[in-house]
Amino acid sequence: LLRQLDPIQPLTVGVWRGVYERENMTEIERYGFDNSDIVSYHNYGTYLQNIEAIRKLKSYGRPILNTEWLNRCGGNTVEAMFPLFYLEEIGCYNWGLVAGKYQTFEPWNNVWDGYRKNPEAYANFDFTKWFHDLYRPSLNPYDPRETELIQMLCARADANFARTQAQP
């Protein structure tokens, strides 16, 4: 049905449950995935878990976009993940930008509930770090090194893209 509307932009349905093998997807997930021009996915996992997810998703031969990834409390940091996305040529953005009413700098409620039930399961979880947001309410960065890294790698990606577009 969507293709009949002749969309002018690529279509995507997010692969957000962490199921990257088509044969393990539900029928509705497969339908969305099969009709997507771009693979978009969420992964708050570790660096190694993201490498494995990327390996599986690249096998489909489509552009990839990670739409949720930053989880500082769980060890998933800008310093680790943004260079990986840059090197793998994966677009990304994170959930939350400026700390505010939505409180995406806080861990999710289910994390707090899980901690209350089983603190040992969160032994490696650093509750002193912000979960998502990049900027404070003052609009200063949470960590200037993060935003500097993002700006530097985005500038490199833009330059690489410009070079590919300039070639005959």
Give the label of every model feature segment.
Residues 1-168:
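Substrate-binding clefts and catalytic carboxylate motifs of secreted carbohydrate-active enzymes
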